[in-house]
Amino acid sequence: MNYKDAGVNIDEGNKLVKMIKPIAKTTLTANVLEGIGGFAGLFEIKNYKNPVLISSTDGVGTKLKIAFMMDKHDTVGIDLVAMCVNDVIVTGAKPLFFLDYFATGKLKSETAVEVIKGIAEGCKIAGCALIGGETAELPGFYKEGEYDLAGFCVGIVEKEELIDTKSIKKGDAIIGLASSGIHSNGYSLVRKVFFEKNNFSVKDFIPELGMNLGDALLTPTKIYVKSIEALKELKIKGMAHITGGGFIDNIPRILRKSIAAKINKGSWKIPTIFNLIQRLGDIEEREMYRTFNMGIGMVVIVDPSDVDKALEKLNGIGEKAYVIGEIVESEGGVIL
């Protein structure tokens, strides 16, 4: 008996490494000293006076179930990168490098490569290097054809350029940056609504969406790195990545207890997919705002005097952005 008999194919793992090396190479920056293949990725830090390293880790959650149902694996890697880098940039940091963890019961290189291609694409959009990762073959641990992902991102910022959320005060404006769709949160509820309660198939064409349900649900999470870079000349007082917990749980993370975010519903158009979920699932409005991004993937808080310039810069790079509310004196966290 050997390791392969027990369900772990080392040769398949080595084959995968050879396949992904050239893919990862397309993401490398001048600061990468050693990337995929070594025991560790090496990254050199230059030209910083008082640097602070910022780290984040995340996954894609049960959105992966949609990828399995569709047998489409080339976009979930973008989701993985987005979930990590969007958390890093809210501090004022620039993403430097990324690592991934891919775990499956029986390794299929062709599937794994599609995932890695998505990760590399996400890294290129975010301007960070894919310098390493781990592929784990765990026989008997996952259902056939299924896998799980985790991502790890490190960014950097000068200490004096860290976003100071303590400066947020009454009257500050809340700018919302449009999401690309559901992003990567709330999929357990999404699957319950569409597939269990209403017996939809991922192949069903949804006229309101103009596409098959599966394609709509797999739309990649938006990466906001370039959008936030466009605002670097302005004083950003705070940012919130609208992920699990939606508006209700994420925006208060950057607010003092004496102030709240008053959101003006109707100041942006809620994407059709959320209206469908709410109607088909008979979900209360506040629950929607606590589960989903509702069309706003990133919130940026600025002084009212900077609003016009911020919108001009964002619109100038093709970013859809809206003034969606203001900061008020209250202990309510988020007021809808």
Swiss-Prot record:
Keyword line: ATP-binding, Cytoplasm, Ligase, Nucleotide-binding, Purine biosynthesis
Output a single Gene Ontology CC term carried by this record: cytosol
The text of the family note is:
Belongs to the AIR synthase family.
The UniProt entry lists the main location of this chain as cytoplasm
Protein location: Cytoplasm
Provide the top EC class.
ligase
Q: What is its EC number?
A: 6.3.3.1
Task: Name one process (GO BP) from the record.
Answer: 'de novo' IMP biosynthetic process
Report the pathway entry. Answer: Purine metabolism; IMP biosynthesis via de novo pathway; 5-amino-1-(5-phospho-D-ribosyl)imidazole from N(2)-formyl-N(1)-(5-phospho-D-ribosyl)glycinamide: step 2/2
Give the superkingdom in one word: Bacteria
Extract the PANTHER family matched here. Answer: TRIFUNCTIONAL PURINE BIOSYNTHETIC PROTEIN ADENOSINE-3, TRIFUNCTIONAL PURINE BIOSYNTHETIC PROTEIN ADENOSINE-3-RELATED
SUPFAM superfamilies, per database record? PurM C-terminal domain-like, PurM N-terminal domain-like
The name under which this protein is listed is Phosphoribosylformylglycinamidine cyclo-ligase
Family annotation (HAMAP family) = AIRS (MF_00741)
The record lists the catalysed reaction(s) as: 2-formamido-N(1)-(5-O-phospho-beta-D-ribosyl)acetamidine + ATP = 5-amino-1-(5-phospho-beta-D-ribosyl)imidazole + ADP + phosphate + H(+)
A Gene Ontology MF term for this entry? phosphoribosylformylglycinamidine cyclo-ligase activity
